[in-house]
Amino acid sequence: MDVKAITACCEPVLTETLGEDEATELAGAFKVLADPARLRLLSMIANAPGGEGCACDLVGPLGRSQPTVSHHLGVLTDAGLITREKRGRWAWYRVVPERLAVLRDALGVPPDGSPGCC
């Protein structure tokens, strides 16, 4: 692999130095996503019909207890990665695309998910 050619064609991942507050915020969000169960929950919600998932439908596929799933959903909600809407007895969750875009941009991933020039 020609590293020089790849480096020459690709833009740097971070084009500006992160400030302390921005770095802390990004690190917190990435820490939340570092848990495999939370990462799976986020992907399950994002890929659910209509882009939203009911907490009641996430327990079985995740293979965790209802209290554990609720805890992880709360952590994702507190991090601003998903929103929660109460409908009757059930809570429905939806991904916050703008929040994920910030994380994607920090990693230098193009919006269309393509590998870019490399």
Spans of features found by a protein language model:
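N-terminal helix-turn-helix DNA-binding core of bacterial DNA-binding proteins
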Residues: 20, 24-65, 91-99
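Beta-hairpin "wing" of winged helix-turn-helix
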Residues: 78-87, 94
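Base-recognition residues in the alpha-helical recognition helix of bacterial helix-turn-helix
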Residues: 43, 70-74, 89
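Alpha-helical residues within the helix-turn-helix
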Residues: 60, 71, 77-78
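A cross-family signal for key residues in well-ordered alpha-helices
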Residues: 31, 40-43, 77, 83, ...
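Amphipathic alpha-helical dimerization/coiled-coil segments
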Residues: 1-25, 46-48, 97-118
